[in-house]
């Protein structure tokens, strides 16, 4: 039964509401809530307050508490600390620093230099106790120095196990893809060979790149394996290494590879890469460039059958076998009216742009004012006709030799346009060794690539769950940065998956925005005497959706008690 007890502090007595129970046969206080001084208790009973607050603060709470709850369920701090023991002079353990970095990546990405100021705006210091000065950016760097490549691999492997046991994650279907991220590392820095100039997918050709291979589950798009590599290396060159590591990891959590199916796109295709997949015995679903298989494309549309009218209205297919990449395997040629229409619209826009450029060049040559020789004009025409399929439909003829005599004529071959559309538009060739699957399941597996693509887009969002900003300039620290950035994506997608299963269908950003709306208000009181102001904390009002999320992620355990 609850009771009120007083505790003497100097000349003053402060009162608490306590509840006792027997623990191991002995009476113990199991809960305690501060009520205040005698005057404050009397004022509360009278429905008044002895003093008004002198000021207030607003702290970030909901999103950070939910993320920390997920990190706690994963056991991140303990896992990291098991491979990177804490130094005696460190303000916090290595695991704590990595958890703090990952949480920051999820809710409000910033540099380590700005971290302490950001942390002060949150309620996190109530449940993560760190000494003053321990959140300095140099302390983060010290912690990162304790995690080499092997330690990161061990941590990632153990986290994979925890995701299966704690969240029931289904690893039978995995999707592999690769991308790269631009960095702002100085060109003269020779301590980060992993950052190289290459084909930037963010179109920043002026910046050095870090490549990232990611394997995510079809069950929620949750990352289970990442691999950072130099940004100047083609994606296809990293495929075998990622598959080998994936097989090693999977065998640590499952006795057999027979249930595992890996999905990847045609960009990873090569005879050597496919030989690796065949040797491992993995199930796979990939794709082949349709234009490489004209005989299959020539199958008449009357031979196509519906894939699944309920799941994929309008989608039809031809289910056959095909020899490619050195093997003969099942091939599912699909035709999608939606893709067909989109490709047709896109190609019409490309054609219109090419026609406009040809007309401009034609008019310029007709005026006889060009100074370019014939070879230069031919190169300009070739550049205009270079986009995919344009050269099949537009025909350009250049006459004359002298620059002032050069003339251009061009025409659109509408019959060629029609043949092109009938042959290619709307078609995909899926390549798989899952012969027992219905065609609809093969299509579903291939389309699950959207999960990893969504993850890459999320990591390029500068506001939440972002890869950047990255202010590191050595290989080792870049790899640690990649690790906790991928971990942030893992946590965010686990949260989205958990919300989805609870009937809350929202994107990562929508989810975090709802949680961020749960704030903590701090009221500061001072009676005019000596000493620091007394703080009273409370959470802001919540909407029904916010309340459901608060319950779902159990953030109440981090809520203030007084």
Describe each model-derived feature in a short phrase.
Residues 1-60:
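Low-complexity, Ser/Thr/Pro-rich intrinsically disordered linker/stalk segments at domain junctions
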Residues 3-6, 12-16, 24-28, 54, ...:
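Anion-binding and metal-coordination hotspots
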Residues 47-93:
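Accessory, often N-terminal, substrate/partner-engagement and coupling regions
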